[in-house]
Each structure stands twice: as C-alpha cells, then as structure tokens.
Design a protein with these regions (language model features):
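Long, charge-dense
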Residues: 97-115
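DNA polymerase processivity clamps
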Residues: 1-93, 111-206
Length: 206
C-alpha cells in the first residue's frame, strides 16, 4: 500500500501524542499518550491487513521520507518499504513495549455542551498561551455564552485571552480547564463535546 499525504499527516500528529503506535487490521488508527490523558482515533483511506507495533513512529516516518511515493508492505514481522531500486526492511516492535489505547470508540460521559469551533479560534488561543505564557486553555459558559480562553487557573491575577465561540446557547455554567500541552490537534475545524467528568472530545470530518 501507499500512505496518502493525509495519512502521513495523521501519523505525524499521533507521534506528538505517543512516540509509539500499534497498527491494527482495518482502516482506523488509534493512539493514547503514555500518561493516558490524551486519546485520538482517525479513519484513514488505507486498509491495514496485519497487526504491527512501531516503537518510534517518527523514525518510521523519517524512513518513509527517504523515498518518493514509497510502497509499504505489512509482512508477518516487518515492514518492507520500497521505492525505485531501493528497499528497507523495518522490523516490528513487541506490543508489550507500547502503551496502546482500547479498541473502542471514544464516548463522552454526561456531556454539558457541544460547540463548533473554528481552527482560527483554536489557533489564536494556543498562540495566546505562548505570548502571554499561560499554561492552560479553558472552555467556559455563563449559561448562554461559551468562550475559549488562554488562562492560568492557579493564578488569580494572571492575564487572560478569550474568544466567544458560541452565543445564545442554553447550558449549565461550567469552566473546563485543559493543559495546553494536551492539545495535540490537526489544523482543522472541530465539533467539541464537553463533559463535567473532565473530558473534551474534539471531532473533525477531515
């Protein structure tokens, strides 16, 4: 098979969440951070036939970049990567060495609200955390307006940057804090489901 540019982009993003991955049969790839605080899943255009563990995903992606439009074969115990007259044998890693997520869809318990957020708004808040040196982002609601903010929840006098992402809604008031380091997102718009159980689910059709 040949990995599409979209799949390569997904895998590069996954490598920022967990340096390792287990490919499983089918067209869904999943990952989870070593601390088990961030979980992600994506449907790719390719279909994987066998289970394959990769300890260093960034290394695999760098290996693929050695070729122009490489062919990737999932063997019994290794990848065979071919391009032109060149070839690499890349051995799988034991899954016992990899923190991998459960084989089930992400379900948000007791959601408080669902809001559509543009990448422009997400990106502006993430950039604000860097400029203002703030460690977190927050989704908050006063009951009718939902805001996305760059914050420091532990310092009452800290600066704050915020953008309104939804108006005229009806929710219970809430304030959900997310560590900026946990926002491992692709640059696209998202439907965000927020739960008082401490979970935010970012879903995109891209």
């Amino acid at each position: 098979m040949k990995f599409s540019n979209e799949t390569i982009g997904v895998l590069k993003n996954f490598a920022t969440i967990n340096p390792s991955i287990v490919f499983k049969p089918g067209s869904t790839v999943r990952t989870i951070s070593p601390q088990k605080t961030v979980m992600a899943a994506a449907t790719i255009s390719e279909t994987v036939d066998v289970q394959a563990g990769v300890y260093d995903l960034s290394r695999l992606l760098a290996t693929l970049s050695l070729f122009e439009n490489p062919e990737v074969d999932f063997g019994d115990d290794k990848f065979t990567i071919k391009g032109g007259r060149s070839e690499v044998k890349y051995t799988y890693t034991s899954e016992s060495l990899i923190v991998s997520p459960p084989d089930k869809d992400i379900v948000v318990p007791d959601p408080e609200a669902t809001v559509n957020v543009t990448w422009a708004d997400i990106d502006s808040v993430i950039r604000a955390t860097g400029v203002l040196q703030l460690p977190e982002v927050a989704f908050s609601s006063d009951g009718s307006t939902i805001k996305l903010s760059a914050v420091d929840s532990k310092t009452s006098t800290a600066d704050k940057y915020e953008v309104v992402v939804a108006e005229g809604v009806s929710t219970e008031p809430f304030n959900m804090i997310i560590k900026t380091d946990n926002l491992k997102l692709m640059p696209t718009d998202y439907e965000v489901t927020l739960s008082s159980k401490g979970m935010a689910h970012f879903k995109s059709d891209v």
